[in-house]
């Protein structure tokens, strides 16, 4: 008889082991056997919980996107009466949260984006994540700008966030958070009306 709560513990172990493997050898070279060894379980456990490597990658990406959503929402909930500028900075902060810019998370995101072009389930996850970011940004800009301007500003800020993140991921160096926040703050203030 399985121990109560063991499923969530095992899933967490396997997702963490997947992130470690992707960080060290890349998604394509990470094998089920390597991931199982890192997690201290048999390969059969992975099949039991996730079917196969694609199922495990999907669960890993769902976990990372969930962490992203939580990082953004926690910051927004702390600012219920915040200005549009403050709330836009909170969204930026969530996207540059440590859960999203650690070496393992960045490599997993890169692998996820590449795989999403060929795997329908990962593509759907990627689209949900991208739409959520754009929707959140446009919603906040919309508090101060007409619809078309808000959409353009939201799209531009999403591109800036993704671009800063991608440049850091491909550089192999940690994201320069002060610079990233300075650049995004400048973009935001350029697009919001002055008082």
From Swiss-Prot:
Residues 31-50 bind DNA. The keyword Mitochondrion does not apply. SUPFAM superfamilies: Homeodomain-like, Tetracyclin repressor-like, C-terminal domain. Pfam families: TetR_C_6, TetR_N. InterPro entries: BetI_C, DNA-bd_HTH_TetR-type_CS, Homeodomain-like_sf, HTH-type_TetR-like_transc_reg, HTH_TetR, Tet_transcr_reg_TetR-rel_C_sf, Tscrpt_rep_BetI. NCBIfam families: betaine_BetI, PRK00767.1. Repressor involved in the biosynthesis of the osmoprotectant glycine betaine. It represses transcription of the choline transporter BetT and the genes of BetAB involved in the synthesis of glycine betaine. This is HTH-type transcriptional regulator BetI. The gene is betI.
């Amino acid at each position: 008889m399985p121990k109560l709560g063991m499923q969530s513990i095992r899933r967490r172990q396997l997702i963490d082991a997947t992130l470690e493997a992707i960080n060290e050898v890349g998604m394509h070279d990470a094998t089920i056997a390597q991931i199982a060894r890192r997690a201290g379980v048999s390969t059969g456990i992975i099949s039991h919980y996730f079917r196969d490597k694609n199922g495990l990658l999907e669960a890993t990406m769902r976990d990372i996107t969930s962490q992203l959503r939580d990082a953004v929402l926690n910051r927004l909930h702390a600012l219920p009466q915040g200005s549009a500028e403050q709330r836009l900075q909170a969204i930026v902060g969530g996207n540059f949260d440590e859960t999203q810019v650690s070496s393992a998370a960045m490599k997993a995101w890169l692998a996820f984006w590449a795989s999403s072009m060929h795997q329908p389930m990962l593509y759907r996850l990627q689209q949900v994540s991208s739409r959520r970011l754009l929707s959140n940004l446009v919603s906040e800009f919309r508090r101060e700008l007409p619809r078309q301007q808000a959409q353009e500003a939201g799209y531009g800020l999403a591109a800036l966030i993704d671009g800063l993140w991608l440049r850091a991921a491909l550089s192999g160096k940690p994201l320069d958070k002060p610079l990233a926040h300075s650049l995004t703050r400048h973009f935001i203030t350029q697009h919001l009306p002055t008082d």
